[in-house]
Amino acid sequence: MSSTMEQYEQRTGGEFATAIDLAHLSRQTLGDRTLEREVLELFRRQARILLFRFEAVTCPSERAQIAHTLKGSARGVGAGRVAYAADELERAANAGEPTGKALAEVAEAVAEATSAIELRFGFDR
């Protein structure tokens, strides 16, 4: 392997490893790499859709449910930062508190995770 390729894999692998807990993902998929790819592609799509849905609704209970769904999805694939941020967003929505700051954190965490997934697997944005 060329040194350029090694550097690329180290850079993207490190970014992926911070966004997705690889050991957790492997346990969830029983080590099946094809299933890992499929699950991550579903998460990537769903996370973006849920962000748009959250912004589109105004009812606090609906917003909390959307955040809860994202939290569960993130936990399933090992996207810890997304799960933590979604938990904070769910809490704020349930409490009727402003959600702007929590939503910005979720959006940033989702962007980090989805970018890492796209880099690792070459998915189109």
Where are the model-predicted features located?
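Two-component system phosphorelay core
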Residues: M1-R125
